[in-house]
Regions:
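Domain-level signal for Mg2+-assisted phosphodiester chemistry and nucleotide/NA-binding surfaces
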Residues: 2-108
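Nuclease catalytic cores that cleave nucleic-acid phosphodiester bonds
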Residues: 98-201
Length: 201
């Protein structure tokens, strides 16, 4: 990864992640698939996962555009346990470039005066209101609390020209956005193929 410390937060494409939630889901998948497949599952490849999210969000190879990846996380958490690279501090301001474009990471810890859900919603709202942002992909904690429902209500006001995708582990109530299943991109990042699952499910 390369250093991109002075890059602005927003790009034409933005991915906002509840990083602690994504890490927990990855852990659950690792435990379940290790038992099912009878082999060790390594930590998820973070760059591959981000690529899969971008594709699920409608980006195409050859777009050659910039993507802001915002990792919202608890202040007490230093990094992912189930992704590599893992350190939030080391990821902050770093970038990687591939066939989809350049992905620039920002790590945003939750301060004491707010909650992670509130912070994530504030980040999504700011991206939604930015003229620069054309495509927005959001991975909220859709299992605990009301973050998903609050996002759903807020996105009713979203500009129809913006392409917005929410990711969850199962189909959720719809709204002014597209939905994608989070597990598919995580399975790719964990190196679990459809062929390997044939006959196991």
């Amino acid at each position: 990864m390369t250093e991109k410390k002075n890059e602005p937060l927003w790009s034409e494409n933005v991915i906002v992640v509840d990083a602690d939630y994504a890490d927990r889901v990855a852990f659950d998948l690792i435990v379940n698939f290790e038992r099912m497949l009878g082999r060790r599952i390594p930590a998820a490849d973070l760059a591959r996962w981000i690529d899969c999210l971008a594709l699920d969000g409608g980006m195409k190879p050859g777009d050659d555009t910039s993507v802001a990846v915002v990792l919202v996380h608890d202040k007490s958490s230093n990094g992912f346990d189930n992704f590599l690279p893992a350190s939030y501090r080391e990821l902050d301001g770093k970038a990687f470039k591939d066939h989809l474009g350049e992905f620039v990471f920002s790590s945003v810890p939750v301060e004491h005066l707010t909650t992670k859900d509130d912070l994530l919603i504030d980040v999504v709202q700011a991206a939604m209101e930015s003229e620069e942002v054309k495509r927005l992909m959001v991975i909220p904690n859709s299992e605990d609390g009301d973050c998903y429902d609050r996002l759903r209500q807020m996105l009713r006001r979203a500009d129809d020209r913006k392409r917005i995708t929410l990711f969850a582990m199962q189909p959720m109530p719809g709204g002014n956005f597209r939905q994608e299943i989070l597990g598919y991109s995580l399975m790719q990042a964990l190196g679990i193929s459809a062929a390997e699952l044939d006959g196991k499910l």
